[in-house]
Amino acid sequence: MSGISLGIPDGPPPTLAPRRKTRQLMVGDVGVGSEHPISVQSMTTTKTHDINATLQQIAQLTASGCDIVRVACPKPRDAEALPIIAKKSPIPVIADIHFQPRYIFQAIEAGCAAVRVNPGNIKEFDGRVKEVAKAAGDAGIPIRIGVNGGSLDKRLLEKYGKATPEALVESAIWEAGLFEEHGFGDIAISVKHSDPVVMVEAYRQLAAKTDYPLHLGVTEAGPAFQGTIKSSVAFGALLSQGIGDTIRVSLSADPVEEIKVGDQILQSLNLRPRKLEIVSCPSCGRAQVDVYTLAEEVTAGLEGMEFPLRVAVMGCVVNGPGEARDADLGVASGNGKGQIFVKGEVIKTVPEDQIVETLIEEAHRIAEEQGMEAVEGASAEVKVTR
């Protein structure tokens, strides 16, 4: 058999590339940079001046695991609401500023943990950098330079013809250089584009040229399904190379979904401790149970579980027993019944209509034996090191 490869690796599977070394920032009490865990952000969809609605949505995001939240500030009454929101929010608040530079100073005075500025559409921004740098420096907060393919500086559009990776990177480095000239270096950068390929290349170029922490995002990614695919592909390509320090999954959906997707992306890459993982077969003509419904019911029954548990839901005897044995808990179904596995051992066989109930009970039992909270309750705990 010598010289024949069976495709079995000789050692452990390869790991991701090491995190790219960056300077370190603090956004409120959340660290951003290579020495800190990768954080997950979202943005409120409420009118910021509606303080109660905005704080309520921030509470929902926090409970879902959001680490940092961004709020829009398009009008004077939105800026006026920032002091209360920044004070009462349980997680750091970033003010998102476009067009009007005066809102930057109001956000800093309001106590926001950071400010995102868009150099492509803030009036005469280059001429105001000195003032912004001093105000942010005096307050001890970072600035995110948020370059966006949809609002790139007209000078760069004329130079490159469109929002190319090179144009995005040049914009970001130019603006960062202006801040550095005035002694301000607490900067994070994003170079977002709606095309994941352009976005990935822009971040790769930026990562090679600077040591700023990078906020990853595919802008205008689209509805939940499309946006999840785009963000997962782009983030996976970058994070696997050690590029990226904080992420936001932009979806045309409830912002809580952004947190769920972002958290799952990080878990899938082992960049966050894994929690509940459902392994289920895609179903085929061999399936002897309704795998779709079974997997959905098990997932719903264990939603909010913080305990790291791999649950296999398999629909036939071909791959079912093997997958179930490799999981912490699993079922291999067939002939109107299911074999329940725990740590590779069959512990019982139950009728098909008792599979979901049995799996949920066993999951709780395993978690309780480990002294862990099995259901929702611990899910609001922020996992990022603060």
UniProtKB/Swiss-Prot annotation:
Source organism per UniProt: Corynebacterium urealyticum (strain ATCC 43042 / DSM 7109)
Metal-binding in keyword set: yes
Coiled coil: none
Reaction(s) the record says it catalyses: (2E)-4-hydroxy-3-methylbut-2-enyl diphosphate + oxidized [flavodoxin] + H2O + 2 H(+) = 2-C-methyl-D-erythritol 2,4-cyclic diphosphate + reduced [flavodoxin]
Family of this protein: Belongs to the IspG family.
Cofactor(s) needed: [4Fe-4S] cluster
Gene behind the chain: ispG
Keywords: 4Fe-4S, Iron, Iron-sulfur, Isoprene biosynthesis, Metal-binding, Oxidoreductase
Co-factor: note: Binds 1 [4Fe-4S] cluster.
UniProt: [4Fe-4S] cluster binding residues: 281, 284, 316, 323
This protein's name: 4-hydroxy-3-methylbut-2-en-1-yl diphosphate synthase (flavodoxin)
Pathway involvement of the protein, from the record: Isoprenoid biosynthesis; isopentenyl diphosphate biosynthesis via DXP pathway; isopentenyl diphosphate from 1-deoxy-D-xylulose 5-phosphate: step 5/6
EC number(s) reported in the record: 1.17.7.3
GO biological process: isopentenyl diphosphate biosynthetic process, methylerythritol 4-phosphate pathway; terpenoid biosynthetic process
Signal peptide: none
Entry GO MF terms: 4 iron, 4 sulfur cluster binding; 4-hydroxy-3-methylbut-2-en-1-yl diphosphate synthase activity (ferredoxin); 4-hydroxy-3-methylbut-2-enyl-diphosphate synthase activity (flavodoxin); iron ion binding
Short name of one Pfam family: GcpE
The protein's role, per its UniProt record: Converts 2C-methyl-D-erythritol 2,4-cyclodiphosphate (ME-2,4cPP) into 1-hydroxy-2-methyl-2-(E)-butenyl 4-diphosphate.
